[in-house]
Amino acid sequence: MRIASFFTVLLTLLTLNIAPASAERIRDLVNIQGVRGNALIGYGLVVGLDGSGDQTMQTPFTTQSLTNMLSQLGITVPAGTNMQLKNVAAVMVTAELPPFGRAGQNIDVVVSSLGNAKSLRGGTLLMTPLKGVDNQVYALAQGNVLVGGAGASAGGSSVQVNQLAGGRISNGAVIERELPSTFGASNTIMLQLKNDDFSMAQKVSDAINRSGYGGTATPLDSRTIQVLAPHGNSSQVRFLADVQNIEVNVGIQDAKVVINSRTGSVVMNRDVTLDSCAIAQGNLSVTINQQANVSQPNTPFGGGQTVVTPQTEISVQQAGGALQRVNSSANLNNVVRALNSLGATPMELMSILQAMQSAGCLRAKLEII
């Protein structure tokens, strides 16, 4: 009985000490080299705007584009005609040609104002050819522009929510030309890790070789795994369908903190840890106030001149911050709680995290985008 109880306790302890390893499919970890989208771009016109289009006197290319388009439709605009248009806007149209895109397939397009149009809401994009980097037309775009923002103005005041100078057309372009593909022509396929990691490259290679494809996968560097595959399109499709569903134990990921310097957003993964440190955060504010004073001569008919003299006041205020202790934190919840205790704004938190990394208190890679 004692021996049975001992083994029961030992088995329980071993179960508690073994942390479950997280597994992810290979399709979530890698991209297939050569299977990617291609950028398309075009220039076009959006019409039907409710007086919110380009100011043609300031954007002459809009008038020129409209004249050329009307000429192609058989309508001649007399030379020297000054067209005061308010319902037309010049736009740039972008899209992505998906991998293995076929003629007749629809893709989404993004429409962005090129001139000084106030809003593209309610506009219609006229037929616009979309070209690739080789200057060949691969798709044609046309349709009603969907704008996510909203705005109104009256009496010199205006209110705007989100962006009005850009929109999207769902399935707004039709593929007219297909890209040549070499898929299936070679018996080797290159898998590229989304994040370079030597250990992950080895794990992916070992997982493929253990799943009935022994000797087919070889890691070449920290990002690329070479896989031997059967020849032919249909054979490689079946092969990749099996390989992409193989699970890999990813283990512990690199601790990383990502900071967006434009918006002040701070994002960190679950592996970020902190060491104990003391932080003092102070704010320095400079206020400049300038007023224009009018100086007039004392005698009305003395021949003097009225002058404007600026008066400037500058004040500097510094809000001192006391040292605050930040305890060491071993998990993400404690890290968030410790950073929130500082009471810092996101922009201040960016500077604090940089200083903590320099002091060796932030155990993570700091990436600023």
Swiss-Prot record:
Location comes to:
Periplasm; Bacterial flagellum basal body
**Which key words are in the record?**
Bacterial flagellum, Periplasm, Signal
Say where the protein is mainly found.
periplasm
Identify the domain of life: Bacteria
Q: InterPro entries from the xrefs? A: Flag_FlgI
Molecular function (GO) terms for this protein are: structural molecule activity
Disulfide-linked positions: none
Which Gene Ontology cellular-component terms appear in the entry? bacterial-type flagellum basal body, distal rod, P ring; outer membrane-bounded periplasmic space
May I ask which residue range the UniProt record assigns to the signal sequence? 1-23
Q: Name one GO biological process term.
A: bacterial-type flagellum-dependent cell motility
Kindly state the subunit structure of this protein.
The basal body constitutes a major portion of the flagellar organelle and consists of four rings (L,P,S, and M) mounted on a central rod.
Return the HAMAP family for the record: FlgI
The role this protein plays is: Assembles around the rod to form the L-ring and probably protects the motor/basal body from shearing forces during rotation.
As for family, the record states: Belongs to the FlgI family.
Listed name of the protein: Flagellar P-ring protein
Which species expresses this protein natively?
Answer: Pectobacterium carotovorum subsp. carotovorum (strain PC1)
Gene giving rise to this polypeptide: flgI
